[in-house]
Amino acid sequence: MNHAKQESEVMNLPSTIEVYCVERSLPGLTEKQLADVHWALLRTVERVAKNGGQIRYVRSTFIPDQSRCICIFESSSRELVRTVNETAQIPFTRIENALDFNFLGG
């Protein structure tokens, strides 16, 4: 069994999910504070998934010159993505549906 399938099963993800992009402005954060944001999201997603929520935190990318952070989630709903971010108490500007072409490889 491949790793991706195992991970999806652990995170309660259905076979068809949506990809969501969460955009945030995080001016003045240190690398340590950015790492704390990452870990807060991981812990919150894990807790929500263990309680039956169909969500996975994929990754974040920080753009230092713009103090902008883009976080990618896979989830059964935008509302669940919103709930995770609000529960983690990480401010965000917006949540949008997205396409993730990472599966194409490189």
Region locations from a protein language model:
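Short S/T/G/P-rich N-terminal loop/turn motif that feeds into the first structured element of a domain
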Residues: 1-50, 83, 101-106
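Residue-level signal for beta-strand positions within conserved beta-sheet cores that form or flank
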Residues: 18, 53, 91
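Short, well-ordered beta-strand segments in beta-rich or mixed alpha/beta enzyme
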Residues: 20-24, 58-85
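Surface-exposed loop/turn and secondary-structure junction residues enriched for glycine/proline
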Residues: 29-32, 58, 65, 93, ...
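Short, glycine- and small/hydrophobic-rich beta-strand elements in well-ordered beta-sheets
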Residues: 45-68, 96
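An amphipathic, aromatic/His-enriched active-site/gating alpha helix that lines ligand/cofactor pockets
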Residues: 74-102, 106
